[in-house]
C-alpha cells in the first residue's frame, strides 16, 4: 500500500509539469488555483504515509500531521524551484502560498473527523471548535478562489459592455488595460472635450522610452458583424503627435507583418479616429486577421523625444 501511495504522490507532483493551456487570464487564474486542491491531496497522502510509518514507531498524531504539512510545503517549494530552472514554466510565490493554504485547509478539515485524534486535541472534533475550523476552511478556500471569481465577473462585465472595448469608467474594465513605459490614470475629461455625457477618460502620459503606450489585453474577441473600429483622442498640445495602433489576433506570430499596424496623426483638440474593420482584417501579409479571435489592442508612440500626455476614450466597434 505504501509504495502505491508514494507512486500516487509523485504522480500528483508530476501534474505540475504537464503543459496546460493558459491562453486567457481567467484560465491562468484557474490553473493557479488548482495548486490549492492538488496540495491538499498531497498533504492527505503524506499524512497516510506518516501514519503507516509512524504508528509502529510510536509517533504521536500531532507529529504525523506536522510531518504531512512540512512534507507538502517542502514538495511545493521544490516543485517551484525546479520550475524556475525551466524555460517553459515559471516559479511563482503565489503558487507556493496556494500549496501551503491547500495543505492547511485539507489537513484541518480532515482533523475534525479523524478518530485517531484523542485526548485534549479531541475538542477539535466537537462543536464549537469543529465549526470554527470549518468556517476557517471555507474562508481560506474562498480567498484562494477569489482571483478566479474576480476574473469571472470581469469577463462578464466585458461582455456586457461590448461593443464598447474600453470607456475608462470602471475598475473592472481597467483590469484588462495595462500601461507600458507610460502612466495611465482615469480623470475627468479636459474642458475642450465638449461632450457633457462623458464623466471620465483615460489620461496617458507617454515617457521618452522606446514604445510607451497602453495595451488592452483580451478585449472582447469576436468582432465579426461590425464594420468600424473607433477611438477618440484629445490633445492639449500645440503641435501634432504621432501614435501607432496595433491589433493582434490569437494566431499572431509576433512578426511585424503578421498584425495590424497603423500610424495616426493626433492634431490639437479632439480627434475621432475611425478605421474600417476590412482594413484591419486584411493587414497581415499572407493571411487575414481573424476577427473572431482578437487578442490585443495597443496604442503607443515610437521613441518620442520628450514626455507628453494625451486623453483617450470611447474605444469601441460600430
Regions from the PLM with identified roles:
Residues 1-200:
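Intrinsically disordered, low-complexity, mixed-charge
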Residues 138-318:
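Beta-rich carbohydrate-recognition modules and glycan-binding surfaces
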